[in-house]
UniProtKB/Swiss-Prot annotation:
InterPro entries: PRibTrfase_dom, PRTase-like, PyrR, PyrR_bifunctional. It comes from the Bacteria. It comes from Rubrobacter xylanophilus (strain DSM 9941 / JCM 11954 / NBRC 16129 / PRD-1). The keyword Transcription applies. GO terms for biological process: regulation of DNA-templated transcription. Its EC number is 2.4.2.9. Keywords: Glycosyltransferase, Transcription, Transcription regulation, Transferase. It catalyses: UMP + diphosphate = 5-phospho-alpha-D-ribose 1-diphosphate + uracil. A motif (PRPP-binding) lies at residues 105-117. This is Bifunctional protein PyrR. HAMAP family: PyrR.
Length: 184
């Protein structure tokens, strides 16, 4: 996990690759249990960037556990953020290859912090239709909410100070899996 700190002072390694896999398997089981009566209407939407590979991993777990193909989409929330600083934002584009109307959509992200990303994701998702329900799955919940948002599925709660940051690395985006806390 040498690269995960991105040159910052690593205070703690909180999840290894094996622990991330175990957390995602547990989240996958919890999603199946909670939505057992409507699995055919289930869909996953990863929030760019690291939420997308996490959503694909959860879909892969569900396929292995139940033989069920759950559709996966990618959601770009750039234009829905409330913290744009006036510069031209880099829009990567969403790709949701299914109708969201009437579905139970599980939004997937790597870290839940203030809740602003989740709020922006809900706004972006609701522009595409009216889901029957929206649920939120996160690998890490670090607290410090500014909005009344709570994750339905959490891999690990990691209390942090405001001077610290949580860095998630995934093989698909960073070349290795791991979660570290960096900062003062």
């Amino acid at each position: 996990m040498s690269r995960l700190g991105f040159g910052e002072r690593v205070r703690a390694c909180v999840l290894t690759g094996d622990q991330i896999s175990r957390s995602l398997r547990r989240i996958s089981h919890e999603i199946l249990e909670r939505n057992a009566s409507s699995l055919e209407e289930l869909a996953l939407v990863g929030i760019l960037t690291r939420g997308v590979p996490l959503a694909h991993r959860i879909a892969g777990n569900i396929r292995r556990f139940e033989g069920l193909e759950v559709p996966v989409g990618a959601l770009d929330i750039t234009l829905h953020r409330d913290d744009l600083d006036g510069e031209d934002p880099e829009v990567k584009g969403s790709h949701i290859p299914f109708e969201v109307a009437g579905r139970t959509v599980v939004m997937v992200d790597d870290v839940l912090f203030t809740g602003r990303t989740a709020r922006a994701a809900m706004d972006a998702l609701l522009e595409r239709g009216r889901p029957a329900a929206i649920q939120l799955a996160v690998l890490v919940d670090r607290g410090h909410r500014e909005l009344p948002i709570r994750a339905d599925y959490v891999g690990k709660n990691i209390p942090t100070s405001l001077g610290e940051s949580v860095r998630v690395g995934l093989v698909e985006t960073d070349g290795e899996d791991g979660v570290v806390v960096v900062g003062s």
